């Protein structure tokens, strides 16, 4: 065949099979944090830095970011971070141990004021902390991480069990609905089955059907679990 003809018009490959595609900036200190200080003159990741990250994600055909969280607070360090991400079309979320659009450093920096990161003994303060996070992000497109791990990304206290996690997630959903003014299922949410959290799932802990289940590796690159046929049928999928 010597000739090839293409009919005039616009052609696309359709939407990506995976809705949220992006990066997690983890283990960022000292290399990335020192570079940002040198290149941008800040001790945190500000919107000038993150705008470059958003551009990178978009060039890679992505649309999603878990920001750096060892030393920085994406939302609190620079309020323009979230706004710039939203304007550029990048969806923001928080890591596996940072529920309800709050960065862990926001708690760590005020630990004496807030008290223990323990839902059994300090529920009122923690619920208030969660509420402030949802209130802050309700007007931008974010994916809310739900669930809870222990302080500093460790396991929860020994008195934690599936019933406690169920109560935490149930209360988080109520907070999301109250602060956004719409049903909880209309706000995208993700539950990370990381380390002992997957053990809770294997023991029967379940989340509402609309929640995305994020299956994690074992920190050594070995996938611990793949979604089964039933989990793929869920609205949130896995």
Roles of regions detected by a PLM:
Residues 23, 61, 213:
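Conserved, mostly hydrophobic/aromatic
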Residues 59, 63, 98, 140-144:
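Metallocofactor- and cofactor-centric catalytic cores in central/energy metabolism, strongly enriched
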Residues 30-33, 39-88:
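A conserved hydrophobic secondary-structure block that centers on an alpha-helix together
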Residues 1-5, 14-17, 84-88, 92:
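Carbohydrate-recognition beta-sandwich/jelly-roll modules
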Residues 73, 87-109, 116, 121:
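Acidic/aromatic-lined carbohydrate-recognition and catalytic surfaces
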Residues 238:
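Conserved small/polar residues in nucleotide/adenosyl-binding loops
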Residues 2-7, 69-70, 76-79, 86-87, ...:
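Gly/Pro-rich turn-and-neighbor structural signature
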Residues 34-37, 69, 77-78, 97, ...:
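Short, solvent-exposed loop/turn and secondary-structure capping segments
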